[in-house]
Amino acid sequence: MKKWISLYDLCPVESGTCNDGTVRITAMAYLKNCPDNTQQMEKQLLRTSEYILLRGKHGGGYGGLLRDVNVCATSRITGQAIADLYTSLPKVYRQNAVFMMNAVTMNKLQCALGVYAHDWITSRRDRSLLLMNKPVMLCNAMPFIRKGSVPILFGDFSKVSIKDCGRDELQRESCNGSSDRLLCTMTGYMNCVLEDSQAIWGLKII
């Protein structure tokens, strides 16, 4: 069983108030007109906000957590690159550290390790994965392996502070004059700060 998580499973989320660093996040979806549209859009907003808090906002001033972390540069994913990432994280943060990547990156890492994969990657009793004896958290919002991307993070995510600063009411518009199908929009406001720049490191593809 692979361990699927979201950024919010790893980072403490608290209530907050809007300030100069607050990120405005809007989620949109076409939905059937039903009583649970608000709940559906709240889930959609969480998914959208996870991508933006990690990757940044296109055309906006917020660069995302992946831009804030220190990085180790590599041209490809190898065992040596993973070892360099591991040792770059100061020892004080390793006790609670986890690896975070998407499932495609994990599969490519296993292929790159080849016959030595079982020396690097092991399974726990619940069949969740360990890499270098540290938990692997698979997150759909993490980017794929490509030049310039940071597809793997390693560190103590308790040092990331996320504040939920509220959301606007659900907005609904009919599609093509039909009351059965709606364009739903919900906007939320969040702050995301890496409290300690040494607590999380990333592997950057160059």
Labelled PLM ranges:
Residues K2, R24, G114, G148-P151, ...:
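Generic detection of intrinsically disordered/low-complexity segments and helix-coil linkers/edges
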Residues K3-D9, E50, L54, Q171-I206:
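Protruding loop/beta-arch "assembly-hinge" segments enriched in small, turn-prone residues
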Residues W4-K91, I205-I206:
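Alpha-helical scaffold segments that mediate packing/assembly in large oligomeric complexes
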Residues T26, Y30-K32, M101-T105, D156, ...:
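Helix N-cap / beta->alpha transition motif
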Residues G63-G188:
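Extended oligomerization regions of viral-like shell subunits
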